[in-house]
Amino acid sequence: MERTCTRRWRMKLEIPDVKKLVHEMVMPIRWGDMDAMGHLNNASYMRFMETIRIEWFSAIGCEPNPQGQGPVIVNVFCNFYKQLQYPCNVLMKMYVSDAGRSSFESWATFEPVDQPGVIHAAGGATTIWVDFPAQKSAPLPDWMRALIS
């Protein structure tokens, strides 16, 4: 028996209006970042978001410490609005919001440098603060909470 899908499934997570801009950087699309259709590959969007997140963590002194505490990403998503194609320099903007006991949300937008304000994609991630030796969540440190709030 052949099965057909009669529903249109659509998962789209919204980027909140209330968020705090914490970091910006320009990333060039490299030839190897493209898919067979000449667009920025879906996996590359995740890599771009990872890159700006890690650059921000480094800028605020949040370096990896397996014997202590630090951030762990527990989910990530990206909404695609317009195609990004090579060659292109992409202005990445990173935002944070929603500080909880041990977590916060981060958001990233993608806009071509030559098209200011035209967002081609936007995504986000949930970050949990973890006590690595105990392998469980820990309260956000006050210094991190102050940066997010």
Say what each PLM segment does.
Residues 5, 9-25, 80, 84-86, ...:
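HotDog/MaoC-like acyl-thioester-processing domains
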Residues 5-58:
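Catalytic strand-loop segment that frames the active site of acyl-thioester-processing enzymes
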Residues 18, 42, 69, 74-77, ...:
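Anionic, Ser/Thr-rich low-complexity intrinsically disordered regions
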Residues 31-33, 61, 77-82, 114:
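Short, well-ordered turn and helix-capping elements at secondary-structure junctions
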Residues 45-48, 72, 126:
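Residue-level recognition of specific faces of alpha-helices
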Residues 61-67, 71:
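A short, contiguous structural element within a folded domain that forms the immediate neighborhood
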